[in-house]
Amino acid sequence: MSSRKLVSVQEITGIDPIEGADRIEVARVLGWRVVIGKDMHLKPGDRVAYFETDSLLPAYDPRYKAFQERGQKTMIVGSMEVTGHVLRTVKLRGVYSQGLIMRLDELGFRYTPPVGTDITDKANVLKYEEPLPMGGAQIGRFDAPCSKSDAPRLQTLTGYWDELKTLEAVPTVKVDGTSTTLSMDERGQVHVYSRNWELDSMSSNMQLAKRFQLDKMLWPGMAAQFELCGPGIQSNRLKLPAQRPFVFAVWKDHHKIDRDQWPTGMPNLAVPELDENEWALTGSVDDMIAKVDGLRGNVTKDRLDEGIVWHLHEDQQLSEGLANELGANRCFKIINNKYLTKNGL
């Protein structure tokens, strides 16, 4: 799978009114709903630039000047600080709005690219990454025997929904923490990585992994991916009493393996697995999104869960298009909208 298309050319598939709203309406793009101004005069069939949530609209780019007063965040990119507005899920007039729609000519296009075209670079947009909460120096780039942890949202896979409903998948709770990868090379040396970088052996990530003996569960050529959660991490939104890992994927020689093949002890540290019948892929995309909305209590009693990740069983044949979208991770997610809006995400 290629890197995430933060900004792409998409076609508006529908326009819905908002009760009691004179100036705004809802545009449908893929599986997303985005609140837009009626003065944009958009209609079904129009091609537009769609910006996904987590997009950082840089303050130095005049195309995004109007957004900066809504709030800004700063992140480090290489040796530079970049400040801008980060797109989050919001609720307006009782309607969830996810992402941003702009006209292509607002971005400087004098022609209309095909639907699906990745225009992230042209839009000059970055994916916002929260600062690493754990200590430890970066000593190299991500080089583990696995893919970087990533799962597309179901809203981007609407064209494959009928195929997805024919496949077997394991539903697991998406746990809100810091993504970490632990691997063992062929010489038996253990390495630890953040989402994009290798960290030194004295990092807090490594120390916590060792505390739970994850390093002793690995074999050469194996990698375990997990969320580090608890006090001091991502505001501890799940209110856990202590820091701990939640394993969500295990790999051997760049191939993801099913949970029943994980090393002894690792399933005890896994993210919670949900009932496959209760969370079978049925109905419409909107039905599934609505079902996840409000999910709670699977990690911490009575607290909202972040969402669900469906991991496809590895022995299934996928169409070329779906395989390209999912990549080697072979999973996708639905995020709990109530969780997003409650936490300003």
Where are these regions (language model features)?
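Core nucleotide-handling region used for phosphoryl-transfer chemistry
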Residues: M1-L345
